[in-house]
Amino acid sequence: MIIVDESGSMCAIRQQAFSGMNETLQTIKICAEQNPDLEQYVTLITFDSNHTNFHYNNAEGMAVVPLKESDYRPGGCTPLYDAIGSGIAKVNAQTQDGDSVLVTIITDGYENASREYDLKMVKNLVEKLTEQHWTFTFIGTDDLDVEGMASSMGIRHTLSFARNEEQADAMFKEERECRMCFYNEMIEPTASADVTYFKKKHV
């Protein structure tokens, strides 16, 4: 599951976020095509205070296609907890015991508009599911306390990036590389696998 902030402040890196999502979808599709025995499903969410869009909801990895320009138009505030909570609830209802789930959260702002979920509820969900083969990663701009935000939600894998085009591009590239390592580890587990999802904390 990929959860991407679509609030107004993302306008500054809108094109990089849009391109990065499509490149990530392509990475997922390629991995699914190369490993047909590894069942992969994709849920892609973008959110602001006016909507939560499920662009993909448990779609087969080989079936995903790029988003259209009109699918990502930043505006509004940042109901971060609602997006995470509702996404987790939906994906959790679609998984079975033993399934591995990778959750990637990307934002450039603090929570400021949630109505259904609060921090405690999100943290409880994250901590419970981390014990059940779920991996949570949190990516934020370097003007945020990224590690503090993630820790408060029970997430330990973090990455931060500067709010500019070059660093946003580098962030998505780093995420895709780490995603491929994650997939490869699922296909061929190694005793020496690094327990840290991201190779580095900053890009």
Predicted segments, located by residue:
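Acidic, low-complexity intrinsically disordered regions
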Residues: 1-203
